Amino acid sequence: MLCACATPSQHFSDEAKTLGFASGNLDGEGFRHVVYFAQIDRAADALHVYVEHDGTPWIGVARVSDDPTPRTPFALELMARDHGPRLFLGRPCYFEGRRDSGCSARMWTQRRYAPEVVASMAAALQAFLAKHPYGNVVLIGYSGGGTLAWLLASRVPQTTAVVTIAANLDTQAWTTLHDYSPMNGSLDPVREPALPKSISHVAYVGDRDTNVPPTIVRSFAANHPEAKVIEIATFDHTCCWIERWPELLNAALASRSR
C-alpha cells in the first residue's frame, strides 16, 4: 500500500514500476532527466518517445507547487498500452529533479516550455539515441507534453512523426481563455516555423474538451496547415484517450503514408 506521505515524484515512480518500466537518468544541457523505458533492445526501427502533461505547477490560483510532478500519470498510461520500444522522457525539474542545480519554480510555471527546457530534453534524447540508434523517432505528448513534443520534433533529426493529444499548441490563446498568467519566456508552437516536411503531425483533440477546446488546436493549425487535426466525438481532456490509445496510435502512424 502506498504511504500517504509519499511525494508526487515517489508516487509517479511507484506507478512506473507497477506498470513494468525500467528507470534511469539522462543528462541534458544543464538538467537531469528521469526516464522510463521498455522493450528497448527489441529489434525494431522506430522508438516511441512519450512526454507527460504539465502536472501541478500551481496549487490553487496563487501558490506555486513544491513538486509539479503529475499526480495522475497519463502519458505513462498511454505508453503502457504501446508494445514496441518506448521511452518516457521526463522534463527538467520534475520527478525528483526540482532541487537540481538550475531549477526554480519558473521552470514549471512561466518557463515550462522555454528554449532551455526544449534544448535539454533534446540533448537527453540524443544521448539515449547515441546508445540505442533507432532510425525513426515518434514523439508523443499529452496536453502540455504535446506542446513540448512538437517543439522537440525539429530539434531531434531522427523524428519522423509527432502525435499530440489534447495539446495546448497555441499557448497564448490557451492562457487567455483560462485567464492564466502569460507564459513569459516559453516558446509557443503557433508562432514557431513549420516542421520539416519529413515530419508528420497528427493533432488529436476531443470535441468536449473544455481545458484545450478544439478552437485552440484549430488556431494552431491555421498557422500550421501541415498539421492533421482529428477531432474525436464525445472525448474530453481525459476521456477516453487511454482506453482507445492502441487504435488511435495505429491510425496516426498509418496516416503518414497517405
Which residues fall in each region the model found?
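N-terminal cap/lid segment of alpha/beta-hydrolase-fold proteins
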Residues: 9-40
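Primarily recognizes the serine-hydrolase "nucleophile elbow" in alpha/beta-hydrolase
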Residues: 134-182
